[in-house]
Structures are given as C-alpha cells and as structure tokens.
Amino acid sequence: MTEWNHILKRKDYAPEEPSRLVVNLIPALEKKGAKRILDLGCGAGRNTLYLAEKGFEVHGIDVSETALKTTKKRLEKRKLKAELVKGDMKALPYSNSCFDAIICINAIYHQRRMQIEKTVSEIFRTLRKGGVFLANFHSKRSSRYGKGIKVEEDTFMDEFGPEKGILHHYVDKEELRKLFKDFEKVNLKIEEEKVDNYLRSRIIAVVEK
C-alpha cells in the first residue's frame, strides 16, 4: 500500500473534522444504544477521533501505516482511546457479530467489484443483528466516471495526480441493492453537486443487518 502511505502524508488527505455523514448518524446510533463501532478504512482518523469523543468504543483499521500513525498521534494529543489495527477490509481480524455499527467513508470504492463484495461479506459477518453500516460510493452519474485506465467494468485507475495508481469503482442503486441483499434494511440516497459542467455524484448507503 505504498500509494496510500504516500497520499496520506498530504495534509489535504488528512483532515481533522469528521464527515457530515458520520455526524448525522450519531442520533440513530445513540437511539439504538450502539457502543462498539468500527471505522473501516479509518485513514488519518477524523471519524475515529469524533466517535471516541462521543464516548463510543472505537476500533479503527487501515492498510496504511502512515494513516494509523497519524491517527495514534491525534488520539494521544486529545487524550482519547481507540483500538487501531493494520489490516485488510476484505479479511477483517474480528470475531462474528462483534460491532454495533461500522462506518466506511471514502474508502470502500477503492477496490474492484469482487473485492467490494468480499468486504461487504466481512461487514455482514462482523455486525451484530440490528447493527448499522454506513458508507459512501461513487455514482456512475459522476463526471469522473470513465476517467483513467479501465481495469474492469465500472472500475478505473487514476493515471495522474495525487491518486495515481488508485482504483475507483462506480455504482448505481441497482448494484448496491444486490450488494446489500442479505441486509434487513437498505436505505440509499443520491447526493449531487454541480460546479460549472462538473457533476459530483455519490450514493450514501445506510443499511441494517
């Protein structure tokens, strides 16, 4: 994961403020009495820190040592605690049904389709009954769709810029419904923002086991 170690040294890839998606999920998690949460692909820890501040038992996992070192330093600076592990989201080192919630912000789509399917299988395995999973996905409607080297259907690799060599997989609601077919509840929402002629489109998934 040399690419991610390099990318996550950039300040613009290591923000400290939490994702709005995670902030907005908190009331639902509190209502459910959620306690143990996994930040999947935690990066530099912006959501790990926020969840720890909110009093949750937080676990963070990432493939990048650089990311985990940054997260650890930020936790220590704020005198917060979280269990951090270097690992692969396709083979989570956790027992069955051990998390009340799992979040995955700006991470799950950096894989091939079959790898995403394996990741979702691992998420389902490690979530407790009634547990919640939150993630965002690239939408096929995005202006970025089709840019870079095509590695498979709907998956492209950046050729230039800070994410050179990084995969981006794009989906639509139909694909996500198939992906989450084993979950009891599936809520999908499209969020779009257009600047000049560029459309930023993503799908927010909140699903319950």
Please state what every model-predicted region is:
Residues 39:
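Class I SAM-dependent methyltransferase core
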